[in-house]
Amino acid sequence: SLESPFANQFMWRVDDAIRKYQPDMIYFDDHAGDSQVDLGIDMGLGKLTPQIIANFYNIADKRTEGRKEVVATFKGVGGRYNSFQRNPEMVGIVDRSLVKSTELYTEDDIMAFPFQTEVSLQEWHYQKGGSYRSAEEIITRLMQNVSRNGCLLLNVTQHGRGNIDDEARQICLDVGRWIDINQEAVYSARPFDVWGNNDVIYTRQGGHIYAVILHPSSDPIVLPALSSQSASVGKITKVELVENNRAVPFIQSAEGLTLQLGEPLRSEGIQDMKLAMGYKVVRISHDKAWFNDDDPGVRTFGWDRRCNTHEGDFNNDLSFSNQAGDTWTVTLEARKFSIIAPQGMGQGTMEVLVDGKHVGEVSFVKQREVKHQSVVFTSKKLRKGKHEIQLKNKNGMVAIDAIIIQ
């Protein structure tokens, strides 16, 4: 039952917007749970959240044929402003069902599921004479989020009549220009083994690792995370500066990857000097370009994820399932593939299907010592073209770390 006439009308309005405009994303500036109340208005939104989300997803599933291409964001899912204080066991479930959004806060480490940070260029509502965040600060926040499995919502503060200051416009132009130059390290990029530090930020995509060097110099730069001993990095074959594809001299050793960027050059079209002279992105090619368990295109039903495992898993994360019937699905172009998973962490059976047909099973046996990055299945030769690969839990504990595509 609804909490108030206001909540009743709100529900109808949201339903009307979903059906009429078919949005890809709905943002709610309110808490998902019922133990925090925004602005002192007890309208019952927390108790309506399951109904709103279910309605949004069910309608979208019919429109997108079950591809789950929509997202809803709410606040107060765990963290400092947790709105599930009355039922904390719900946080883990809700975290997988929507994207949690928080003002001015970036998660401290890589997260298993996506999150959003909200930042404003100035105040949320225009203040005459107020100071602006720099383009450099916005890019720093953006890449910190992307590297930890998050995204950034940027509020461009407007005057009451809808226009923006020239300063705000230039900041947006600088941010947009930097993203345009380095977009392959941003759009659809996924977290690497580690997110980085105050000097370098990592992302990955399409078999490449990207390192954002915040303060480049002509002195050698050492990146320990990309050493020859890393569980997620193979033999590095090429390093290039993304903005001009210039080859960067490098040496990979057990201590790390040493780069010689040379004298920093100013990026064209950016007025913010710190951003124009710094924040250089390098593209790193290596021979361990596996498809990770959370790469774009993966569709799951019932599976859970762990990240920051620090146990030797590829990209330091893992997808796993404890429930029969759970499915992990992806469509890839491959003539042959191998499944990488830890052997020994649990006991269960996983069925492998290609284009809907049974091609084999993987048996996981509990062992005293877990062998990470084990090849647990290799397919026979497939016809040329794209194939749907599906992993189905038949019983017990099963997992996937990566797929090697041939």
Model-found features: residue ranges?
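Glycan-recognition surfaces in beta-rich domains, encompassing non-catalytic CBMs
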Residues: 281-406
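Mature catalytic domains of secreted/periplasmic carbohydrate-active enzymes
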Residues: 1-286
